[in-house]
Amino acid sequence: MRLFISLPVLIVVLAMALEGPAPAQATPDLSSTFENLPDKLKEFGNTLEDKARAAIEHIKQKEFLTKTRTWISETFGKMKEKIKTTFA
């Protein structure tokens, strides 16, 4: 009984696989590719701009932290030296 039911299902699946891609899955023609090109380029440009801005912002923040850390260490060193000369 199971073979009797599974054989038609297997034939239908095999027929669907061999008939080829559906029209929606077919490769687009050249004109539709050129029509979508400006939109894709604009999207690519926006993505690139966002990533560049984020990278620059990250670098600025990192540089700010480095400068702050350097300033704090220099100030602490000066205070330490002043205390040594005052109490020595």
Curated annotation (Swiss-Prot):
- Give one GO molecular function term: phospholipase inhibitor activity
Q: Which residue spans adopt a coiled-coil conformation according to this UniProt entry?
A: none
Gene Ontology cellular-component annotations: high-density lipoprotein particle; very-low-density lipoprotein particle
UniProt-listed Pfam families: ApoC-I
Q: Which cysteines link up through disulfide bonds? A: none
Record keyword Lipid metabolism present: no
* Keyword set includes Transport: yes
Subcellular location(s) of the protein: Secreted
Q: Which residues form the signal peptide?
A: 1-26
Report the record's Gene Ontology biological process terms.
Answer: lipid transport; lipoprotein metabolic process; negative regulation of cholesterol transport; negative regulation of lipid catabolic process; negative regulation of very-low-density lipoprotein particle clearance; triglyceride metabolic process; very-low-density lipoprotein particle clearance
For this UniProt record, give its keywords in alphabetical order, as a comma-separated list.
Lipid transport, Secreted, Signal, Transport, VLDL
Give the highest taxon in the source lineage.
Eukaryota
User: Where this protein primarily resides, as one coarse class?
Assistant: secreted
What family does this chain come from, according to its entry? Belongs to the apolipoprotein C1 family.
Give the protein's function. Answer: Inhibitor of lipoprotein binding to the low density lipoprotein (LDL) receptor, LDL receptor-related protein, and very low density lipoprotein (VLDL) receptor. Associates with high density lipoproteins (HDL) and the triacylglycerol-rich lipoproteins in the plasma and makes up about 10% of the protein of the VLDL and 2% of that of HDL. Appears to interfere directly with fatty acid uptake and is also the major plasma inhibitor of cholesteryl ester transfer protein (CETP).
> What's the protein name?
Apolipoprotein C-I
**Organism taxonomic ancestry:** Eukaryota, Metazoa, Chordata, Craniata, Vertebrata
- In the UniProt record, the gene name given for this protein reads APOC1
